[in-house]
Amino acid sequence: MAKWTELQDKSFLEATARERAVGIVDEGTFTEFCGPFDKIYSPHLPLMGEAIEYDDGLVAGVGKIGKKPIFVISQEGRFIGGSIGEVSGAKMVKTIQLASDLYEEMVSEKPDLPEEMRPAVVISFETGGVRLHEANAGLLAHAEVMDQIQNCRGRVPIISLIGSRVGCFGGMGFVAAATDVIIMSQFGRLGLTGPEVIEQEMGKDEFDASDRALVYRTTGGKHKYIIGDCNYLAADSIRSFRETTTAVLQKPMEEIETFRRIGSMEKIKEQIELVKLSVSLKPKDSMDVWAHAGNENPESLINMTLDEFLAQAKRLKA
């Protein structure tokens, strides 16, 4: 692996799960849990004649950003599409639980715990969701992760990073939506049903998964930023994701809580208004939504640089 300083300028899109995990925290602070040398792999895959990975396609560990303990979860899309099975799911669950337990321990020792020391969880998503090979074990893992995220609400901030090749789809799309903050790059993709699955089930006339422009207009970072599914857009480098994460974590927990998409009656009302808008607007393309948000020439936003886009793009208000 490259040195930490070299990792900072590496493309987030191209980086491996381990590179993202190491690079997002301060230099030399990352300690991995259940790494490859521990050889904890899926018990289901060998029974089906499938290849295994000794980390089950997920890197988990802890590091620091300043004085703040950062529990990191990073998915590897190069292994079965970053899918979540029994072992990788258990690693996610336990890592979040460790962050929660540490927070409780720190507060018991120091009730007025400074914000700069509050533990946080950072999840770098690269996944198509549940690992179909492991069926209910993978589904159960999703439920247990969601349970831990809810347990952390108002106590331990959980930040999603989405900018890797596979994107974040399937059940993990629900998981990302349940976290406090979502940071994406323009190359990140977020959704529930992936483009290929939509085409397979509904036909190419309904959604052409080979049309990359269409895919990014529908699930990409710029679209998600305009409609409010994504809180922040970062450049395509580990450094940019790290800097954006650091900036978010400098905010008090009460403010971070306001960035959520779900979890309160107010948020439910906002979502209902968006559903009403989609019914009345009847958009044929994301460009219709961008225009409704106040972007007079929405097509011009597509090829803008990140800085230009952030300066000019108007976001949707329900």
UniProtKB/Swiss-Prot annotation:
GO terms for biological process: carbohydrate metabolic process; fatty acid biosynthetic process; malonyl-CoA biosynthetic process. It comes from the Bacteria. Its main location: cytoplasm. GO terms for cellular component: cytoplasm. One of its GO terms (molecular function) is acetyl-CoA carboxylase activity. Its EC number is 2.1.3.10. Gamma subunit of the biotin-dependent malonate decarboxylase multienzyme complex (EC 7.2.4.4). The two subunits MADC and MADD are required for the transfer of the malonate carboxy group from the acyl-carrier protein (ACP) to the prosthetic group of the biotin carrier MADF. Required for the regeneration of ACP. This is Malonyl-S-ACP:biotin-protein carboxyltransferase MADC. It comes from Malonomonas rubra. The gene is madC.
